[in-house]
Amino acid sequence: MKKSVLSIVVFIGMTCITIAQSPNKMLAISMQTLKDKIAGGWAGKMIGVTYGAPTEFNYLQRINNDSIKWTPADIKGSVWQDDIYVQLTFLMAMDKYGMEAPAVKYQEMLAKAGYQLWCANMQARKNYFDGIYPPMSGNPAYNYRADDIDFQIEADYIGFMNPGMIQNIINECDKIGHIMNYGDGIYGGIFLSALYSAAFFENDIQKVIETGLSSIPAESDYARIVRDVMKLHRHYPTDWKAAWQELDAKWGDVDISGAGSAFNIDAKLNGAFIVMGLLYGDLDDYKTLEITTRCGADSDCNPSNALAVIGVIKGFSNLPPEMQKGVKDVGDSVFINTTYSFNTAVEATYNYAL
């Protein structure tokens, strides 16, 4: 993964990283802030996935109006979640083979990992043992789950280690995403990674989403559904449920994996629910979690991504104290079948970002 122009500069005792987005645009971030925001992203993943876990796929094409029970102690369950352990395997592949390693090395480590996989990831594992490698392992000809949510929920690390470097994100997602996905399934990973990348420097959630949109093809269905959510938010600025109803009426039946049923693990609809949570959540941690979860479908993955965006924007040190404590309490717990804990993942991601 070749980095854009990046340098470390010392200003009056404060070490900063400067990033050249273009010949005429430079971005700067202190190394302390960079690490805090990376930690906020990983923490958001852990908090969000455990917040929504009891509701996952229990609310299909219907809003969740039931009570949601969560405590910071629940964060300990994040070590069992594929939203996190798959991408930590990809970090392990980088550690072992280097940042420029070919995609098949990542696929090999994914295939041989001891944890359970589902959907597009499970097919990518089977494809490896059948001798089908990237990019064909994610092609619909060999993986009918190619539009599923898999890469979208495990591309976070790419955004975390590429602050302000959208082209790096596109290049890396194109390589890794084709292990298990194709088309909108890859665009979801690019879009989410670009949200994180923008969130290092931008607090306006509308602008963060616009940056994400600019990173994927405008004519793609993924871009279309995100634009629809933004339009619905403008039309119903205080009524997310009305926006949800119109969104579901148009896009609720797009998942080939759930054809003929209400089941939907499609990347773009679940991505739209992430955007809905971000827009209507108003940068409030709990409000963002609640709305994203109540949208239903893959309702542990979606709040996990949504709060990770908030975590990067705010930084770990600005998350609610009880959330910080819940993460710190399990900070050294190792995610299953990986070598990484929260603390070591933050450190490694930070080092790769430099």
Where are these regions (language model features)?
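Bacterial Sec-dependent N-terminal signal peptides
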Residues: 1-24
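Active-site-adjacent bridging/hinge elements
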Residues: 22, 55-70, 122-136, 161-172, ...
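Accessory "access/gating" subregions that flank catalytic or transport cores
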Residues: 29, 138-146, 162-165, 174-178, ...
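Mature N-terminal segment immediately following signal peptide/propeptide cleavage
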Residues: 29-52
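Mature, well-folded catalytic/scaffold domains that follow N-terminal targeting or propeptide regions
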Residues: 38-39, 89, 134-138, 144-152, ...
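Catalytic phosphate/nucleotide-handling subdomain of diverse soluble enzymes
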Residues: 51-53, 58, 62-68, 180-184, ...
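Active-site-surrounding "flap" and adjacent substrate/cofactor-binding loops of secreted or lumenal enzymes
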Residues: 53-88, 103-118
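Extracytoplasmic mature domains of secreted/periplasmic and thylakoid-lumen proteins
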Residues: 98-154, 158-163
